[in-house]
Amino acid sequence: MKFIPSYFRIETPLLSPKYKFITYKRVENFRINLDGFNNSEDYLISQMGSKSRSQLRRRIHRLEACFNINYVFYYGDISKQKYDFLFKELKLLIERRFNQRGDSYSLKDKWNFIKENSYQLILEKKASLFVIYDENKPIDICLSYHFQNITQHLIRSYDIDYSKYWVGQIDIWKQIDWCLLNNFKIFDLMWGKLDYKVRWCNEISLFEHHFIFKNNNPLKLLFVKIMINLYKISDYVKQKCFFKWLIKTKLNFTLNPKSQIEKKESIITLETISKMPLNDDITSININNASYKFLRKTVYDFQYLNFENTANINVFKINNEVDSYIVQGAKSQIKVLIN
C-alpha cells in the first residue's frame, strides 16, 4: 500500500509469524487539522499573525470591490455540461500556471481518469468542485475528494492574471470555512512543499508505504529492499531538482523582476497620463477578446492599485501608435506600451 497518511488508522490483522510487515516513511504530507476550531476566523488567528490576517482581508475586499465575485461549491449537484466546462477551464489554468513556473504537472498522465470518474463522485458527495467566478469566468478552480470527515485536496489552479489579489490564498480560506460548516475535520493538501501549504498547514507528517510479505521468501525481501532504495533515490533526485528549480527561479526574479510569462511574451511599460486623447485618435477594445488577452493582467493590476470596479474600466488602442493602449478608470488613466 502506498502514500498512506498518518491520520489513517489501518487495522491490520495479527500476522502469522510467517509474514513480515515493513513500513517506509516517504514524502511529506501537508494538512490542516480543524479539530477544535469553531470557524475559519479562529483557525486564521491560530495560524497567522495580525499583519498576515490583515493582508488577506485586504486582498479579499479588493477582489470583491473590483470584480463581481461569486464563490460556488458544487457538492452533490452539477450538470454534466457545467462539469465538462469547468474541467476544460481547469486544465487551461493549470497549463498556463505551470508554463509560468517552468514546471511539469504531476497528475498530467492521470487527467483523463480523474475527469471520467469525478463527475459521479460529486453527485454522490464524495467529491466537490470549488470555483471562484468573476462574473461567469472561473478564476480559481479546486477539485477535492471527501470521505468520512476528511477533505482531500487533489487539483487546484487559478488565473495568474489575478495573482495580485491572492486568489489562491482566498481559495484556501473559503474552503476551510466550508469544511467547518460541513463537519470535515481534516483538509489534506497532500504532498509538495509549497509556500502556501507551509503558511496554512498546522500539521506535517510523512506518507507511509506498507510492505507485507512471507518471511521465508528471500526474493520478496530483496524486492522490498530494492523498492525502498529506489524510492530513496527517486525522492533525493526530485528534491535536488526542486531546489535547483527554486534557486533558478528566485535568481531570475532577482536579476529581472518581471515575471517569466511577461519575459516570454513582451515587456510592458506604463505611463500615467493626465488627460485622454481625442476620440478620433483612439479605438475602444474589449480585453475579453482573445486578441487582447495580453492586456488583462495589466488592467487587473490597475484596478487593484486604484480600487476601480470593472464597470468603470475602459480600454482603448491608440490609432497612430504601434502597440500602445490606454486603460481608463473613473479616477485616473494610464498609457500601456508593449515592447
Q: Where in this protein do the model-derived segments appear?
A:
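A general structural signal for short secondary-structure boundary/capping elements
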Residues: 47-52, 66-67, 74-80, 136, ...
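Aromatic (often tryptophan-rich) hydrophobic motifs at membrane interfaces
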Residues: 112-222
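A conserved beta-strand-loop-helix scaffold within acyl/acetyltransferase catalytic domains
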Residues: 4-16, 20-163, 267-339
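Conserved beta-strand positions
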Residues: 1-3, 189
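Charged, amphipathic alpha-helical linkers/stalks
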Residues: 213-265
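A short, structure-level motif marking secondary-structure boundaries and short turns
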Residues: 44-45, 103, 160-162, 178-179, ...
